[in-house]
Amino acid sequence: KNIRRVIQVNQAPIGKTQRSTIVSYLEIFDEIRALFSKTDAAKQMKLGASSFSMNVKGGRCECCQGTGLQKIELNYLPNSYITCPECGGKRFNDQVLSVKYCGKTILDILETPIIDIVNVFKESKKVYQTLSSMIELGLGYLKLGQMSMNLSGGEAQRVKLAKALSSSSYGKNLYILDEPTSGLNDVDIDKFIQVLFSLQKNGETAIIIEHNVEFIKTVADHIIDFGISGGESGGKIVAQGFPEAVFANKVSSLYRLDKLTY
């Protein structure tokens, strides 16, 4: 009754090939391509939504098949990639790149930092909400056309969370997060904390696996401490309860870590 949906967000990669991009993972590319296909220029040239895809024939550069890169196979060495000599890394043919939506080409949308293009999509609720979530989580510097396989574990986790936030109606969702502060600087951690507080205000619950003492102090309502041991020696609850009580408990690993921090 109290939990409507469980959303697990971990640091596993969100893509394994060049075809997997941030925009495709976020599931907003269909809406973006539809917006381009509805422009007068696209209609005059009879360019449908599929013409603005890198993954199918029609509008993409066939030399690189829409990746913007060409693979160079080397004997006894890892494969190398060079910019496509046909399109110069632009992924699409000239006809498609002549079409603009709100002054932007499809390449502009894919290759410009999210924070600089979010307002282009104010009239598209899903796209705008998703990009806004990315910015709130400190990912405004990413580009939609980036290969998702190149994201760090921390970035991948926040992209997953942004997708979940934009696709879930608030209330009675349970988020399970695995070390979300891993690899984040203090500024990004602060942004992430504000997102968690926002979730809490909207009736959401989060279970977080974390080792960052300051982060735990700031966000936790209830702590379950499994101690510092791992393997066969771990997995035992050494303390639990309100944060103040756990940090004051001399048996707790957080008590010792907190003393070391200061």
Regions found by a protein language model. Name each.
Residues K1-Y262:
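Conserved phosphate-binding elements of NTP-dependent enzyme cores
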